[in-house]
């Protein structure tokens, strides 16, 4: 069971920071149609503070798993043209950018944007965006080489 707040876990030998939460751009549509929606979908200020305290206590992580990504990683090419981006609440992405700037990590994985993508390497760091079709082998992801592709790390 994963906590619904920032938390640190050990997955095998990998120290992992988990950070839930993201803004739903289709929130109004969900409300109008009585579809499921989580009012507390984003972290509160106090929950964000928990994450800040965790990276002070554990400044080095092997892996970060988050629902959305730091603001600088956003896949702008995947933004839905029908939604006015100026109305999208970016607090989570800005917060994750703050975490990313202060944390020493090897790998970062997230979903939210409904696509699969490996990002270009940044020093020894690799970033992975996944949707729901693929399952990544954690050991392959954590030990991948610059020449590996997304297909090389699929379970």
Locations of the language-model features?
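Active-site environment of divalent metal-dependent phosphoester hydrolases
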Residues: 9, 24-27, 70-75, 99, ...
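Hydrophobic/aromatic beta-strand patches that form the interior of the parallel beta-sheet core
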Residues: 17, 107-109, 129
């Amino acid at each position: 069971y994963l906590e619904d707040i920032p938390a640190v876990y050990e997955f095998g030998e990998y120290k992992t920071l988990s950070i839930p939460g993201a803004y739903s751009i289709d929130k109004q549509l969900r409300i109008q149609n009585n579809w499921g929606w989580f009012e507390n979908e984003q972290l509160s200020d106090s929950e964000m503070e928990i994450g800040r305290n965790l990276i002070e206590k554990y400044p080095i992580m092997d892996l970060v798993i988050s629902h959305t990504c730091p603001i600088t990683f956003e896949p702008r090419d995947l933004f839905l043209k029908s939604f006015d981006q100026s109305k999208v609440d970016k607090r989570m992405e800005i917060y994750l950018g703050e975490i990313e700037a202060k944390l020493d990590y090897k790998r970062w994985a997230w979903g939210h944007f409904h696509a699969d993508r490996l990002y270009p390497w940044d020093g020894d760091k690799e970033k992975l965006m996944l949707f729901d079709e693929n399952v990544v082998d954690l050991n392959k992801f954590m030990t991948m080489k610059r020449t590996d592709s997304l297909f090389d790390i699929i379970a």
